[in-house]
From Swiss-Prot:
CDD domains documented for this protein: PoNe_Nuclease
One Gene Ontology term of the molecular function aspect: nucleic acid binding
Name of the molecule in the record: UPF0102 protein Fphi_0415
Organism of this sequence: Francisella philomiragia subsp. philomiragia (strain ATCC 25017 / CCUG 19701 / FSC 153 / O#319-036)
Family stated for the protein in its record: Belongs to the UPF0102 family.
Top-level taxonomy: Bacteria, Pseudomonadati, Pseudomonadota, Gammaproteobacteria, Thiotrichales
């Protein structure tokens, strides 16, 4: 299976998981040039959640949780700002950055994976 197919499968698995937790999926693979994309954008009651999905099939060297770098966090923040500019109806919502880490078949949902400085 190609890397992009694996990533898409992991993101779909994460979306299904989030729906079981009563989150409303607003967007998947939101493109925010030049910062890349946000894997999933969802509503958790009145909180707008920007979610990065990381998948690792092997955890011998590193777990998925360890793959969210500072650089990636900055790109997510910038991409979230673009989403908010394009969708002003969400400008007064609380915002949160979460991580869905999938290690093999285990899903770990880390709310507030990082905060704005």
């Amino acid at each position: 299976m190609k890397t992009i197919e694996i990533g898409n499968k992991a993101e779909e698995q994460a979306s299904k998981f989030l729906r079981t937790k009563n989150l409303q999926i607003l967007a998947q693979n939101f493109k925010a040039f030049p910062y890349g994309e946000i894997d999933i954008i969802a509503l958790d009651q009145n909180t707008l959640v920007f979610i990065e999905v990381k998948y690792r099939s092997k955890t011998k060297f590193a777990k998925a949780e360890e793959m969210l770098t500072y650089s990636k966090q900055q790109k997510l923040i910038n991409a979230a700002n673009i989403f908010l500019q394009e969708n002003p109806k969400f400008e007064n919502y609380e915002c949160r950055f979460d991580l869905i880490a999938i290690n093999k078949e285990d899903i770990n949902w880390i709310k507030n994976a990082f905060i704005l400085n």
